[in-house]
Amino acid sequence: MSVVIRPAKTTDIKAIRQIIDMYTLQRRLLAKETVTLYEDVQEFVVAELDGKIIGCGALHVLWEDLGEVRTVAVIEEHRGKKIGHEILTTIIERAKKLGLKRLFCLTFETKFFAGHGFKEITGAPVEPEVYQELLLSYDEGIAEFLDLESVKPNTLGNTRMLLHL
């Protein structure tokens, strides 16, 4: 069978949790609480092969024209088979359909994202008034996007990248 990229369902969260945990142990993804995964299930797509979830990725809308690619990961035995590329391509298409103009990511996998047109940036690519509004969010990912001191230990070594759609 071939790999199917589809929207995640609540029944996929346990598999998504396992994939994230594998990468968290390697310090390649930030840990996420299970409750957060359920709250954000509608943001996720999964890669499914023969009924098994083998990869995931999420699109989080930050502002009117800006989204963030989060948690793109594929289980080890299926890495190198372009599944991550299929996941990211699906996320990019979802972003375009939503009317987003830019996608942000915070990553160690710079070559992977550069292969899709992402460019390295510094700082938060938003106007000062939008920055102030984003400060009101409780989402830790937005704190990472804003490069706040409180989350710097979590993001050390990551590269900030941006794609113009």
Placement of each model-derived feature along the sequence:
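Short amphipathic alpha-helix that is part of the acyltransferase structural core
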Residues: 1-31, 48, 157-165
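C-terminal "cap" of GNAT-fold acetyltransferases
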Residues: 126-165
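Conserved acetyl-CoA-binding loop-helix of GNAT-fold acetyltransferases
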Residues: 80-93, 104-105
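A conserved beta-strand-loop-helix scaffold within acyl/acetyltransferase catalytic domains
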Residues: 31-44, 49, 55-74
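Conserved active-site alpha-helix within GNAT-family acetyltransferase domains
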Residues: 97, 101, 107-135
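A short, internal acetyl-CoA/4′-phosphopantetheine-binding micro-motif in the GNAT/acyltransferase core
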Residues: 72-79, 108
